């Protein structure tokens, strides 16, 4: 019998670094369906661009979706000096989710946090420890600037964003990243240090 061995059969697509149009995403889903894959992990945000419309925070896409330039290969001082961007409206998200469902594919969105957030910080610099200025990254690597957990507005922002995301995706799973979050800003941020003391933690690592 032609039956899958694994219940979770997924593929990942990073549209934060390299934007894919709606039609390109649908072709990707078609290829997944041919191979009977059923989970589409959609990496929608990163330092290099914010790709999902959040109505409560419009500058995430008007500002955070566009980087001024992109590094060429891994030549650290060589950039193309060409603005690059793109994002999906909420209607486009719904269209893609429905298209995937018609092919027995569940879409699992990823909003990467608390690191990999330069695109959001560029749009809303008050969410960072230093207050900026920040810039949507045009290079690779791991940025020191991340969300500031020492202020309540950061958590309000995350709750608002995730509320809208949950409303767009019927998936039982939402990916929130959690990777590569340097703590150098937290070490020097008075608000973060106050939060550490308030929670009774040993240090920035808990």
Give the location of each predicted region.
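Short, internal active-site loops enriched in acidic
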Residues: 113-115, 179-184
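Feature activates predominantly on carbohydrate-active enzymes
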Residues: 1-175, 189, 196
């Amino acid at each position: 019998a032609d039956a899958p061995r694994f219940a979770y059969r997924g593929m990942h697509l990073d549209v934060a670094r390299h934007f894919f149009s709606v039609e390109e995403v649908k072709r990707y889903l078609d290829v997944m369906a041919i191979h009977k894959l059923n989970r589409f992990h959609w990496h929608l945000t990163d330092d290099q661009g914010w790709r999902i419309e959040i109505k409560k925070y419009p500058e995430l896409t008007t500002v955070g979706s566009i980087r001024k330039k992109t590094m060429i290969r891994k030549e650290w001082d060589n950039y193309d000096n060409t603005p690059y961007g793109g994002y999906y409206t909420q209607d486009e998200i719904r269209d893609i989710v429905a298209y995937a469902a018609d092919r027995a594919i569940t879409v699992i969105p990823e909003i990467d946090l608390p690191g990999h957030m330069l695109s959001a910080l560029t749009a809303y610099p008050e969410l960072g420890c230093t207050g900026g200025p920040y810039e949507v990254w045009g290079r690779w690597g791991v940025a020191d600037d991340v969300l500031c957990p020492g202020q309540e507005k950061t958590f309000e922002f995350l709750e608002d964003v995730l509320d809208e995301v949950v409303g767009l995706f019927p998936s039982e799973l939402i990916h929130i990243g959690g990777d590569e979050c340097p703590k150098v800003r937290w070490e020097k941020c008075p608000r973060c240090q106050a939060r550490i003391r308030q929670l009774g933690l040993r240090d920035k690592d808990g």
